[in-house]
A protein has these predicted regions:
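Intrinsically disordered, low-complexity regions enriched in small/polar residues
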Residues: 37, 49-50, 88-90, 98, ...
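Solvent-exposed loop and beta-edge segments used for protein-protein assembly and interaction
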Residues: 42, 109-111, 152, 163
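Extracellular Ig-like/FN3 beta-sandwich strand-entry sites
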Residues: 45-47, 164-168
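Extracellular structured ligand-interaction cores
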Residues: 3-5, 112-114, 129, 168
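Short, well-ordered helical secondary-structure segments
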Residues: 37, 102-104, 134
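Basic K/R-rich, polyanion-interacting modules in nucleoproteins and related proteins
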Residues: 75-126
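Long, internal scaffold/assembly segments composed of regular secondary structure
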Residues: 2-84
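Aromatic-rich carbohydrate-binding modules that target alpha-glucans
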Residues: 13-30, 116-163, 170
Length: 170
């Protein structure tokens, strides 16, 4: 006797999953799952991304760089618009890749940079918290990646250290 449990993940994120699915049909040596709506996730736009493979130069997603105790990378601000239409832009489903052009073994030689995230809004989201997340933090909503609202600029902000590489985030 064998037991099979099916889990459908949204973008390899274990926090967004569908479980307890039962086969809709049984064939010889096959279990068929022919759901339509039950296995769909609510769509959203693609992940944002940035690349810090070279700390001293701006690259994808980086608006400004400052050299302090570590390099500070200020990402282009994202603009919140709940009416924004879906736009196809290939991403890596919230994942990240440690990489650098400044060393041979990125896993042990890549440096860290202070990443500055910002989300422009017209007003704070009433009763809601805003986070930066992706595979780099196991898609977890933690105090470290929670954004705080800057009422002077109507912008949510968060800053934390990340190792050099290519990142998807939301």
């Amino acid at each position: 006797r064998q037991e099979i449990k099916v889990v459908v993940l949204k973008n390899e994120n274990w926090n967004e999953k569908i479980t307890n699915l039962q086969p809709t049909f049984f064939k010889a040596n096959q279990l068929l799952y022919t759901y339509t709506n039950k296995t769909n996730f609510w769509g959203d736009n693609e992940y944002y991304n940035f690349d810090t493979k070279f700390l001293r130069n701006r690259s994808l997603g980086i608006q400004q760089i400052e050299k302090k105790e570590v390099y500070h990378h200020y990402l282009y601000p994202e603009n919140y618009n709940k009416y924004k239409k879906y736009t196809y832009f290939p991403d890596i489903n919230g994942q990240f890749v440690i990489r650098t052009l400044e060393a041979n073994d990125a896993e042990i030689e890549a440096d860290y940079a202070m990443m500055h995230f910002s989300l422009n809004t017209y007003q704070p989201f009433s009763g809601k918290e805003v986070y930066v997340y992706g595979a780099f933090n196991n898609f977890e909503l933690t105090p470290e990646n929670k954004m705080s609202f800057d009422s002077e600029n109507n912008t949510y902000r968060a800053s934390f250290l990340l190792k050099q590489g290519f990142y998807n985030y939301s």
